[in-house]
Structures are given as C-alpha cells and as structure tokens.
Amino acid sequence: MSMSTRELGGSLPVENVQQLAAASHNFKDIPNRYIRPELDNHVVVDESLQIPIIDMTKLCSDEQSKGCLDHQELEKLHQACKHWGFFQLINHGAAQVIEEMKVVSEEFFKLPLQEKMKCGQLPNNIEGYGQAFVVSEDQKLDWGDMLFLMSLPVSLRNMRFWPNSPPHFRPTLHNYSKELHKIAMRLFSMMAINLGIEPQKLTSAYEDCNQGIRMNYYPPCVHADKVIGLTPHSDATGLTLLIQINQVQGLQIKKDAKWVPIQPISGAIIVNIGDVLEIMSNGEYSSIEHRAVINFEKERLSVAAFHNPNMTTDIGPLPDLVKTSGEKYKRLSHQEYIKLVVASKLDGKSLLDHMKITH
C-alpha cells in the first residue's frame, strides 16, 4: 500500500532565494518575510562541544548477529542516540556514491533558474524544486531553496520532478538512494540490539521504507544574522542521513539550551534520530532540534536522505518497548501521521509534542 505525494498536500510557491540573494546588496533588498527578529541569537553558541563520531567498521559485520566486533563502539552508538540524537558516521563504505552525489548536486544548483524550474513544485505536491513547509501567505520564510524527491519505494518515484540535467543526475541519485538505504538498515539493526529487541522488530518497518531525498542550497546573505537557512526543528522522520557538499559550516544542534555547530568531517555522513524513531523507541532515543544558519560570504549545500517506515506501519511505540513503562506516545496510521507532518510548518519539536501522551 502506498500513498501518492499529491494526496499529502504541498507547499505554497514563494520567490526563488538563490535569485533573490544575487540581487540583494543591502538590508533593504531582503523582503520582510525572510527577516527573523524572533531568532534566539541570545542563546549561546558552544563551539567546544562536538557530536559523537561512530566508526561503522567497528559495528557488527553481520546485521542479524549480536556478535559484534566492538562492543564499545556499539555502546557509543547507543549513548549517541540517547543523549545527542546526532552523530557523524565514518568508514561507511559509500565514499564513491557520495562524491558522485556531491558533483551532481553542485551542477544542478548552478543551472539557470529556467532550467531548474522544469522540475519546479506543482500545487498540492511536496515534490520538486522550491521550498518546503510553506503553509500560509504570512509565514516567515527560510533563506534557501531545495529539490525534494521521493526515491523509495521505486514505485513512488515521479520522474517529472527528476532533473534531466545534469545528464548523469538520475543514475547517480538512484545509486545514492540504494546505498544510503543499506546504511540506514544496518544502523537500525544495531539500534535494535542496543534497545534489547530482535533486529527484525525494528528493521521490518524500514525494509520497504519511504525514502525522500532533499537537496538544499543556502546562498550567502549580506545580513546573515537576520535570516535563517532552516527554521529550528526536529525531523519528522525515522532516521536522516545527511552529507555536507562543500564543507561550509552551518548546521547547528540544540544541546542543553546551547547551539552546537557541527564541524564537517570530510566524507562523513551526519546521522540524526527523527521523531518517528523517538516514538518507536518509546522515548529511549531522542530526536533533537537543529537549524541551518547562513554564511555572510559563502553558499552552503547539503543533501539529506529521510527514512520513514513503510506505509503499512503504524506510527507508535514498538510493543516490546512498552511492557514496563507503558506507551508514552500516541499511535497513528502512517497516512494520518504524514498528513499531519505536511500540514505543519517547521516549529521546534511541536509535532512530537502533539504525539506525546500526557497524563
């Protein structure tokens, strides 16, 4: 059972930010919808903290086995998921497809606007080139453009939104999608072991998962401190795997009421726990609020791969994890949950708060 992206709703059309940035030379050139006086710039940015680094070669060689090569690394993964919600994954075996994805991402965003708009968003559709989560005409906007594509299952791919230019874009994204799903499945297996359940209890929900790929372009801004690339939020997904294209710093996570900049490691995949995995783990693992800030002089590019359970899986705590403490989160059908996500604007962890059971 699947659900077309047209059934989910969409995002309202807005001005192209890359073009807007090229024409903005001072503060008055920036439309008011992008100025964010509510930004919590008073919150301390702590550059001394760093998210954990996980070496995938030290995790289990056999996804179905509990005989791990390095129990210490497995515990390190567990603590990262519990207390950080973010980690950088190294030695993951996907270096080649990542480099190829970086090339086509940069080439796509360098195309003339007219060419990029050939795969522009359509009314009531979340896919395509534009902006996401714009649900009202008076909503404040993010300083960035994106291309969002459904990549898995293959039956959900709408090739109308898959660029023909650059010419090697489609096969590159196909290979990238496949390899990142393999990595996500291995991580889900390790997480299940850490949660004390059989891997299949978690991985079965993601074997035919819904995977979406979002390519992000954040242009520089003459008043970078007055705009935001991506509004503070937690991901509404199960697991997000992100690569930073040009190593320009901009991703920050909120840890202990402080914003922590993520220092990009060349070739690493940044992994973060989404709201769905927090719900499925019954709160054992935590999604975390994060944002993208803008650079005064340099553009920043990234590619995020979002992994959600298949559409037959209800969104709720796994039965094996509620025996002692009871369910801490509501249970929705996947269709109900996705409709809730698409109808919501990015706003901290408000979506997850909606799912919590209050006594």
PLM feature spans:
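Peripheral, non-catalytic segments flanking oxidoreductase cores
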Residues: 1-359
